[in-house]
């Protein structure tokens, strides 16, 4: 199944959450922090703000840092993804 975001929305997949701390403590789901680094899977065509077209800055394959509580979580074919708006992207990670 392919998801194609609309407007200024972006489909991302978060980096896996840490299951065990560096000291070996296993973390239950209730105390794990939501990761903020994600990979861009798909990008919408852009949106309209104040009557003007907004170009998308991020592109498919980018690694990004996103706001901690941004987006809508979805599950597709057993995989977890999040749909966010471009404004929720704080930075693009460049290697």
Curated annotation (Swiss-Prot):
<dbReference type="GO" id="GO:0005524">
    <property type="term" value="F:ATP binding"/>
</dbReference>
<dbReference type="InterPro" id="IPR018369">
    <property type="entry name" value="Chaprnonin_Cpn10_CS"/>
</dbReference>
<comment type="function">
    <text>Together with the chaperonin GroEL, plays an essential role in assisting protein folding. The GroEL-GroES system forms a nano-cage that allows encapsulation of the non-native substrate proteins and provides a physical environment optimized to promote and accelerate protein folding. GroES binds to the apical surface of the GroEL ring, thereby capping the opening of the GroEL channel.</text>
</comment>
<dbReference type="InterPro" id="IPR020818">
    <property type="entry name" value="Chaperonin_GroES"/>
</dbReference>
<dbReference type="InterPro" id="IPR011032">
    <property type="entry name" value="GroES-like_sf"/>
</dbReference>
<dbReference type="Pfam" id="PF00166">
    <property type="entry name" value="Cpn10"/>
</dbReference>
<comment type="subunit">
    <text>Heptamer of 7 subunits arranged in a ring. Interacts with the chaperonin GroEL.</text>
</comment>
<keyword id="KW-0143">Chaperone</keyword>
<dbReference type="GO" id="GO:0044183">
    <property type="term" value="F:protein folding chaperone"/>
</dbReference>
<dbReference type="InterPro" id="IPR037124">
    <property type="entry name" value="Chaperonin_GroES_sf"/>
</dbReference>
<keyword id="KW-0963">Cytoplasm</keyword>
<dbReference type="GO" id="GO:0051082">
    <property type="term" value="F:unfolded protein binding"/>
</dbReference>
<dbReference type="GO" id="GO:0051085">
    <property type="term" value="P:chaperone cofactor-dependent protein refolding"/>
</dbReference>
<protein>
    <recommendedName>
        <fullName>Co-chaperonin GroES</fullName>
    </recommendedName>
</protein>
<dbReference type="GO" id="GO:0005737">
    <property type="term" value="C:cytoplasm"/>
</dbReference>
<dbReference type="GO" id="GO:0051087">
    <property type="term" value="F:protein-folding chaperone binding"/>
</dbReference>
<dbReference type="GO" id="GO:0046872">
    <property type="term" value="F:metal ion binding"/>
</dbReference>
<comment type="similarity">
    <text>Belongs to the GroES chaperonin family.</text>
</comment>
């Amino acid at each position: 199944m392919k998801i194609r975001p609309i407007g200024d929305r972006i489909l991302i997949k978060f980096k896996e959450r840490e299951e065990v701390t560096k000291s070996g403590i296993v973390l239950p789901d209730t105390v794990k922090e939501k990761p903020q680094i994600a990979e861009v899977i798909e990008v919408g065509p852009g949106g309209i703000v104040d009557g003007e077209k907004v170009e998308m800055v991020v592109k498919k394959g980018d690694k990004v840092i996103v706001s901690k509580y941004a987006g809508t979580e979805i599950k597709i074919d057993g995989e977890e993804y999040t749909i966010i708006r471009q404004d929720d992207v704080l930075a693009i990670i460049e290697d």
